[in-house]
Amino acid sequence: MKKAGLLFLVMIVIAVVAAGIGYWKLTGEESDTLRKIVLEECLPNQQQNQNPSPCAEVKPNAGYVVLKDLNGPLQYLLMPTYRINGTESPLLTDPSTPNFFWLAWQARDFMSKKYGQPVPDRAVSLAINSRTGRTQNHFHIHISCIRPDVREQLDNNLANISSRWLPLPGGLRGHEYLARRVTESELVQRSPFMMLAEEVPEAREHMGSYGLAMVRQSDNSFVLLATQRNLLTLNRASAEEIQDHQCEILR
């Protein structure tokens, strides 16, 4: 019993340290790097010179930019042209806010252009990390390849994913996930952030503790994946963990 108690105490200490490291990462100057790129470089250059550089695309009227990430050959980031920190922002559950996940899905074409040939939809994934699972304080959705093992697991669970948020059997990458099937028409009309906030009990009050991902299924539906921070299981809710920025799935 004493050993079990000691082990539990050690796990708590590790969890607290992990949380502290996550907080430390978000308090330095480097956590504002993406925001500075968007607001001080991409947006002004587009407005003054009709050149989105260093971004790949700038859409001021639509409220977003697309930037090639330095990590991985095909990874891109979709970000707002104004200040939104991350999943904790109440703006994401405001109906007037752009549907960033849908916009990010449209931006997957940048992967194909960079690759030099079409990247199959089944190889693409979108992900945004929780407040403690991210390293940047500017909202950004990762547009990148899906891990082959995650792709296989989702394919195998196609029949188990319904139009309600339910636990995904076995979770992903050692962490618990909720999964929800959505059609393209649903996705166009309603943001995944709103679906999560309105349909999962108490999620609205704790949106910053969630990481969210999206993948296309073989039946042309989409699956939304949500994981919530749980420091006792060392889950910082970094939904980006389902992605493979080296794109092994294309080899």
UniProtKB/Swiss-Prot annotation:
SUPFAM superfamilies: HIT-like (SSF54197)
Keyword Cell membrane listed: yes
Membrane topology according to the record: Single-pass membrane protein
InterPro entries membership: CDP-diacylglyc_Pase, CDP-diacylglyc_Pase_proteobac, HIT-like_sf
Single Gene Ontology MF annotation: CDP-diacylglycerol diphosphatase activity
Pathway where it operates: Phospholipid metabolism; CDP-diacylglycerol degradation; phosphatidate from CDP-diacylglycerol: step 1/1
Major localisation: membrane
Superkingdom per UniProt: Bacteria
EC id: 3.6.1.26
Keywords, alphabetical: Cell inner membrane, Cell membrane, Hydrolase, Lipid biosynthesis, Lipid metabolism, Membrane, Phospholipid biosynthesis, Phospholipid metabolism, Transmembrane, Transmembrane helix
Entry's transmembrane regions: 4-24
Xref: Pfam families: CDH
Known catalytic reactions: a CDP-1,2-diacyl-sn-glycerol + H2O = a 1,2-diacyl-sn-glycero-3-phosphate + CMP + 2 H(+)
Location(s) in or outside the cell: Cell inner membrane
Assigned protein family: Belongs to the Cdh family.
Alphabetized HAMAP family for the sequence: Cdh
Name the record gives this protein: CDP-diacylglycerol pyrophosphatase
